[in-house]
């Protein structure tokens, strides 16, 4: 299943394909956690204990698997205290699962749910990363391409600026010329590859591209993934038509 949404930076989509079909959110939910942190009254300079013990939505306790995390740095700080700001940055720049659950533990699930609601999303992310007990109980993080597009359009400039630091640039970013600014978040597990970004061409207005793929091309690797190459091809094609997006949205 391939879902695509193309829209101006602010405005209704100009192209949709399976736009409201739900996909497993994977790490795209980290953008919503970041927005919830930004909109909270939490002190980003406060120091947070780095632990690997979290409360499941079922009431049990779970932890993250270090081998499944794309960012080793937060794991090296286990038992220490680090600034919340650093965790928020690692969550979106290197897609740290451990940092995500630590941030989620600070801000709370209701605040993240409010981010999705304000964006106009039908889906959301009601549980943390690797909360297997909640997943077995039917609590799933599901989003559509339209949900992700609306989320990006709802974000404050400061949140988008942090999303520009995403270092995983093998899908939508790989389809753009070098140096093109984009703010977004991607996610991948076996069977799923998603990516949504606000792209800033120098010669055209900003546009949002959101692509969700569920199927056999998604091998679950952060690099050398056929599904990532598919998303890059889509991104390249949209880039070539970037001058028509704003006009089509009027």
Give the label of every model feature segment.
Residues 1-2, 80-84, 94-152:
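Mid-domain, small-residue-enriched loop/turn segments at the edges of structured enzyme/sensor domains
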Residues 1-24, 39-41:
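Short pre-catalytic segments that frame enzyme active sites
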Residues 10-14, 22, 106-108, 156-170, ...:
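Structured C-terminal helix/loop/strand segments within mature extracytoplasmic catalytic/sensor domains
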Residues 137-178:
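A conserved catalytic-loop motif detector
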Residues 35-42, 105, 150-156, 236-240:
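Short glycine/serine- and small hydrophobic-enriched flexible loop segments
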Residues 56-101, 109:
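Conserved catalytic neighborhood of penicillin-recognizing serine enzymes
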Residues 24-50, 91, 209:
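Active-site SXXK
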Residues 16-23, 73-78, 86-90, 98-104, ...:
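Second-shell loop/turn segments in exported
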């Amino acid at each position: 299943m391939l879902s695509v949404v193309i829209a101006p930076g602010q405005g209704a989509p100009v192209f949709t394909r399976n736009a409201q079909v739900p996909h497993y959110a994977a790490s795209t939910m980290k953008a919503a956690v970041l927005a919830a942190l930004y909109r909270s009254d939490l002190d980003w300079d406060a120091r947070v204990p780095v632990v690997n013990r979290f409360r499941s939505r079922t009431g049990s306790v779970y932890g993250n698997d270090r081998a499944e995390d794309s960012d080793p740095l937060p794991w090296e700080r286990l038992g220490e205290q680090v600034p919340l700001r650093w965790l928020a940055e690692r969550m979106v720049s290197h897609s740290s699962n451990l940092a995500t659950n630590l941030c989620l533990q600070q801000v709370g699930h209701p605040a993240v749910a409010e981010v999705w609601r304000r964006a106009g999303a039908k889906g959301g992310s009601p549980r943390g990363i690797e909360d297997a007990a909640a997943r077995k109980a039917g609590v799933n993080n599901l989003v559509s391409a339209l949900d992700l597009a609306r989320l990006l359009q709802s974000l404050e400039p400061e949140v988008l600026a942090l999303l520009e630091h995403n270092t995983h640039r093998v899908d939508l970013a790989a389809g753009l010329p070098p140096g093109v600014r984009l703010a977004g978040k991607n996610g991948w597990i076996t069977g799923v590859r998603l990516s949504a970004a606000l792209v800033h061409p120098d010669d055209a207005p900003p546009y949002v591209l959101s692509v969700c793929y569920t199927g056999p091309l998604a091998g679950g690797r952060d690099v050398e993934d056929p599904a990532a190459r598919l998303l890059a091809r889509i991104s390249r094609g949209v880039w070539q038509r970037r001058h028509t997006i704003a006009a089509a949205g009027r």
